Swiss-Prot record:
Binding sites annotated in the UniProt record for 5-methyltetrahydropteroyltri-L-glutamate: 16-19, 124, 529-530, 575, 619
Binding site for L-homocysteine: 445-447, 498, 613
Annotated residues for binding of Zn(2+): 655, 657, 679, 740
Catalytic residue positions: 708 (proton donor)
Protein function: Catalyzes the transfer of a methyl group from 5-methyltetrahydrofolate to homocysteine resulting in methionine formation.
InterPro entries per the UniProt record, alphabetical: Cbl-indep_Met_Synth_N (IPR013215), Cobalamin-indep_Met_synthase (IPR006276), Met_Synth_C/arc (IPR002629), UROD/MetE-like_sf (IPR038071)
Disulphide-bonded residues: none
Protein name (database record): 5-methyltetrahydropteroyltriglutamate--homocysteine methyltransferase
Co-factor binding comment: Binds 1 zinc ion per subunit.
Taxonomic placement: Bacteria, Pseudomonadati, Pseudomonadota, Gammaproteobacteria, Pseudomonadales
Protein family per UniProt: Belongs to the vitamin-B12 independent methionine synthase family.
Gene from which this protein is expressed: metE
Residues that coordinate or bind L-methionine: 445-447, 498, 613
C-alpha cells in the first residue's frame, strides 16, 4: 500500500499561539510551565489534524521553540562557550539557554554590568524566507547528547496513539549549515566526532519503538564539492548498522549530479522534490533500487495553491508501476513554509478561496493521492479528482486571473524600454547640475521610526474607527515631523519617512490589481516573528498612483530634494506567494510595468530622485550556480524596465541590504541605477572590495552605521569608514547614509546618530 506522510508541519498554530506564548514568556507574563503547556497543546492538535486528514506517518521533531536547527544544536551539545552560564547545575542546556542563543543574553561568561552576549547569526534557510540560527563550531568541538526534547515528543505522540517518524537534520547538512569559529578549519574534520551522537540518538529512538527516522539532507540539491560527497558515503555507511529504517529527504531542488550518490547510500528510502524538479523523476526511477522506499513530493509545501491532483497522480502512477507498496506520497518539503489552515479564512472571496490550500488542506491532498494509488475507484477519490479538475479549469479560464490589457502591454515591451536615454557618465553630469549637492551628500534609506502613535492610527483606520481624512491628517503630521527633523539635522536629500506604510511589500500590493490578502495566512520567519505574505493570483497592474500624493506633500514642505520611495519588482515578487501558472519572470515584468508607471508619475510631480529598493535581489538566486545567470538576466531586466522611462536629469537610486556582492557585482552594475546604497558598516567596508575589483561605474552610498543596534556611533568612526570607502571608490561618487531604514529605531538614537553622520560628511568636505 502506498503511504501518506508529511516531512513537517507548521509549528506556530492557526492563531499564532506559539508566537503569543513566546512573547508572553519573554516579557515575564507567562511562566515556563505555561509556555510548555502551549507547546504540548499545539503538538497534540497538529498531530491530530494531520491524522484526521489521512496522514499515516506523522512527523515528530518538527516542532521547535525558536528554530529547528537551533534545537538540533542543543540536542548535539553545540552550545557556544559564551552561553554556558545559561545552563543548569549539571552543565546541560535549559529552555533559557536556547533563547539566549537565539536572542542574546546578559551576564553570560563572566560578562558584567548588563553586557549582552550576542546571539548566534541568523540567516536564510536555503532559498526560502525562513531563517535559521547558524551553528558555531570550534576546531576542538565536542558533541554530546544534551537535549531531551525529541525523545519527550516521541513519548507524547505514542501516548496519543500516533505512528510517528522522527525528523532529524542530517549530519552533512548540519555541518554545511554551520560556521567555523576561531582558527580556520574544515568542518568535515568534525564528522567522525559527530556521528557517534547520531548513533546514540538512533539507539534511543529504537528503544522507544520507532521504526522509521527521516534525515533531512537538502544539501544534496546543491553543488557539492567532492570531499562532501565522499563524506556522505562515509557517514551513512557508519550509520547503517543502527536498528532503524532511514529515509533521506531532499528538497528545494533536483539531485542532478548527486543522484548516483543519493541512490546508492545505504539507507532504506529517498524523498525527492517533484515540485521544484519534476524532470528528475525518470532518472530517479532508473537509478533507485525498487526494494527501497521512494517518497515523492508532489504537493507544493512552499506555496498556497491547490494541487493539480491529476497532474500529480500521473507522476505517482508512473512511479507506482515500479515501486508498488514502496511508494510514499508527501509534500515537496516541510509544510512549515505554508500557512496553517485555510478554514480560518471566513472573509475571502469564495472563488479565490477555492483555488487555495494551506497546510491542513495540503495534508488532505497528500492523503487523497495516496488513496488514489491504493483504491482508485473509491468514492472520495473520484469526487476529489473531479473537484480538482473543475477548480484547475476555473482558475485557468478566469477573467480575474487573465487581463488582456496587461498581457498586450507586456507583449509590446521593447529593448528600448529597458534602456536609459543616455549613459551614466552623461546622466550624472546633468543630475549634478540640477541637484547641486555638496561632496559626500547625506541621505537616509527611507523609513523613520514607526512610533506607537503611527501604529495605533493605522490600526484604528483599518478597523473603521478613524476616518480617511483623520488618518491622512495623522500621517501628514508624522511627515511634517520627519521633514522638520531632517532639515534641522542638515541632511542633503530628504525622505518622507514612510509613516503610512505597514510593510514595504504589503503597502504596494494592497494598491495593485492581481493581489489577494488573507487574515490568517501567517508563516514563521524565525522565532516569534511571523509574516503574512500577499498572494499574487492574477495579472498585475496599477489602477492609480500609490505614493504620489504623500511624496508631493512632503516635497511641498521643503526646498531640499525629496526622494520618492518604491519597492522594486523582484522584492515584491520574492516576498509574496507567487503564481504557479506563469513564470516568475513574467510576474516580475508585470510588476516592473506597474512600478514604472509610478516612477513616471513621481517624475511628473516634480520629484527629482526616485529610490527603488531591491532588498531581495540576491535572495532570488537559484541554489545551483548553473541556473544563476538566467535568473540574474530577468531580474536585472525587470529593474531596468521599471527604472528606465525617466529623463536623464531624474536620478534613480536603489538599496540592497545583504552582505555578499562579489558573485553578482556585474549584474548589480547592469541594473544601471545612478546611485546604489548598500549595507557595509558591520563588515568595516570590506564589502567594497567587490566594487573596487570590478571598477563599479556609478555612485555608491556605503552604509556608515549599523541601524540594527541602538548604539549611537561616534563621528570619528564614520569619518574613518568613509575614508576607507574613499580609498576604494572615487570620493566624487560617494554618498553618506545609514545601512538600512530606521523604522525599528527610536527617535532619540536616530537623531543622535544622524547628527554625527552629517558631522562626519561635513568634516570630509573640508
Amino acid at each position: 500500500m502506498a503511504l501518506a506522510h508529511n516531512l513537517g508541519f507548521p509549528r506556530i498554530g492557526a492563531d499564532r499561539e506559539l508566537k503569543k506564548a513566546l512573547e508572553a514568556y519573554w516579557k515575564g507574563d507567562l511562566d515556563q510551565t505555561g509556555l510548555r503547556a502551549v507547546g504540548q497543546q499545539l503538538r497534540a492538535a497538529h498531530w491530530q489534524v494531520q491524522k484526521e486528514a489521512g496522514i499515516e506517518l506523522l512527523p515528530v521533531g518538527d516542532f521547535a521553540w525558536y528554530d529547528q536547527v537551533l534545537t538540533h544544536s542543543l540536542t548535539l551539545g553545540v552550545i557556544p562557550e559564551r552561553f554556558s552560564p545559561a545552563q543548569d547545575a549539571a552543565g546541560l542546556p535549559t529552555l533559557d539557554t536556547l533563547f539566549a542563543m537565539a536572542r542574546g543574553a546578559s551576564n553570560c561568561c563572566g560578562a558584567s554590568h548588563g553586557k549582552t552576549q550576542h546571539a548566534q547569526e541568523l540567516t536564510k534557510w536555503f532559498d526560502t524566507n525562513y531563517h535559521y540560527l547558524v551553528p558555531e563550531f570550534t576546531q576542538d568541538q565536542r558533541f554530546q547528547l544534551s537535549w531531551e526534547q525529541l525523545f519527550e515528543e516521541v513519548d507524547e505522540a505514542h501516548a496519543l496513539g500516533h505512528k510517528v517518524k522522527p525528523v532529524l537534520i542530517g549530519p552533512l547538512t548540519y555541518l554545511w549549515l554551520g560556521k567555523a569559529k576561531g582558527d580556520s578549519f574544515d568542518r568535515l574534520e568534525l564528522l567522525d566526532r559527530l556521528l557517534p551522537v547520531y548513533g546514540e540518538i538512533l539507539g534511543r529512538l529504537a528503544a522507544q519503538g520507532v521504526e522509521w527516522v527521516q534525515f533531512d539532507e537538502p544539501v544534496l540539491t546543491l553543488d557539492l564539492p567532492q570531499d562532501w560527497k565522499t563524506a556522505f558515503e562515509r557517514a551513512y555507511h557508519s550509520l547503517q548498522y543502527s536498528p532503524l529504517k532511514k529515509l533521506v529527504a531532499t528538497y528545494f531542488g533536483g539531485l542532478e549530479d548527486n543522484l548516483g550518490l543519493a541512490a546508492t547510500l545505504p539507507v532504506d528510502g529517498l524523498h525527492i522534490d517533484l515540485v521544484r524538479a519534476p524532470e528528475q523523476l525518470p532518472a530517479v526511477l532508473d537509478r533507485l533500487p525498487s526494494y527501497k522506499v521512494l517518497s515523492l513530493g508532489v504537493v507544493n509545501g512552499r506555496n498556497v495553491w491547490r494541487c493539480d491532483l491529476d497532474n500529480a497522480l500521473a507522476a505517482l502512477q508512473q512511479a507506482h508501476a515500479r515501486f508498488g507498496d514502496n511508494l510514499w506520497v508527501a509534500g515537496s518539503c516541510s509544510l512549515l513554509h505554508s500557512p496553517v489552515d485555510l478554514n480560518r479564512e471566513d472573509r475571502l472571496d469564495p472563488e479565490l478561496k477555492g483555488w487555495l490550500a494551506f497546510a491542513v488542506q495540503k495534508s488532505r491532498e497528500i492523503a487523497i493521492l495516496s488513496h488514489a494509488l491504493n483504491d482508485p475507484e473509491a468514492t472520495e477519490v473520484v469526487e476529489a479528482l473531479a473537484q480538482s479538475c473543475e477548480i484547475q479549469a476555473s482558475r485557468a479560464q478566469s477573467s480575474r486571473v487573465h487581463n488582456p490589457q496587461v498581457q498586450a502591454r507586456l507583449a509590446s515591451v521593447t529593448a528600448a524600454d529597458h534602456q536609459r536615454r543616455s549613459a551614466f557618465a552623461e546622466r550624472i553630469t546633468v543630475q549634478r547640475e540640477r541637484l547641486k549637492l555638496p561632496a559626500f551628500p547625506t541621505t537616509t534609506i527611507g523609513s523613520f521610526p514607526q512610533t506607537s502613535a503611527i501604529r495605533l492610527a493605522r490600526q484604528a483606520h483599518k478597523q473603521g474607527k478613524l476616518s480617511l481624512n483623520d488618518y491622512t491628517d495623522a500621517m501628514r503630521h508624522e511627515i511634517r515631523h520627519a521633514v522638520q527633523v531632517q532639515e534641522n539635522l542638515g541632511l542633503d536629500v530628504l525622505v518622507h519617512g514612510e509613516a503610512e506604510r505597514n510593510d514595504m511589500v504589503e503597502y504596494f500590493a494592497e494598491q495593485l490589481d492581481g493581489y489577494l490578502f488573507t487574515r490568517f495566512g501567517w508563516v514563521q520567519s524565525y522565532g516569534s516573528r511571523c509574516v503574512k505574505p500577499a498572494i499574487i493570483f492574477g495579472d498585475l497592474s496599477r489602477p492609480q498612483p500609490m505614493t504620489v500624493d504623500w511624496i508631493r506633500y512632503a516635497q511641498s514642505l521643503t526646498d531640499k530634494t525629496m526622494k520618492g520611495m518604491l519597492t522594486g519588482p523582484v522584492t515584491m515578487l520574492m516576498w509574496s506567494f507567487s503564481r504557479e501558472d506563469v513564470s516568475r519572470q513574467v510576474q516580475a515584468q508585470q510588476l516592473a510595468l506597474a512600478i514604472r508607471d509610478e516612477v513616471l508619475d513621481l517624475e511628473r510631480a516634480g520629484i527629482k530622485i526616485v529610490q527603488i529598493d531591491e532588498a531581495a535581489f540576491r535572495e532570488g538566486l537559484p541554489l545551483r550556480k548553473a541556473q544563476w545567470q538566467q535568473y540574474l538576466d530577468w531580474a536585472v531586466a525587470a529593474f531596468r524596465l521599471c527604472a528606465s522611462g525617466v529623463r536623464d536629469e531624474t536620478q534613480i537610486h536603489t538599496h540592497m541590504c545583504y552582505s555578499e556582492f562579489n558573485d553578482v557585482i556585474k549584474s548589480i552594475a547592469a541594473m544601471d541605477a545612478d546611485v546604489i546604497t548598500i549595507e557595509t558598516s558591520r563588515s568595516d567596508m570590506e564589502l567594497l572590495d567587490a566594487f573596487e575589483a570590478f571598477d563599479y561605474p556609478n555612485d555608491i552610498g556605503p552604509g556608515v552605521y549599523d541601524i540594527h543596534s541602538p548604539r549611537v556611533p561616534e563621528t570619528a568612526e564614520m569619518v574613518s569608514l568613509i575614508a576607507k570607502a574613499a580609498r576604494r571608490i572615487p570620493a566624487e561618487r560617494l554618498w553618506v547614509n545609514p545601512d538600512c531604514g530606521l523604522k525599528t529605531r527610536g527617535w532619540p538614537e536616530t537623531e543622535a546618530a544622524l547628527i554625527n553622520m552629517v558631522a562626519a560628511a561635513r568634516q570630509l568636505r573640508l
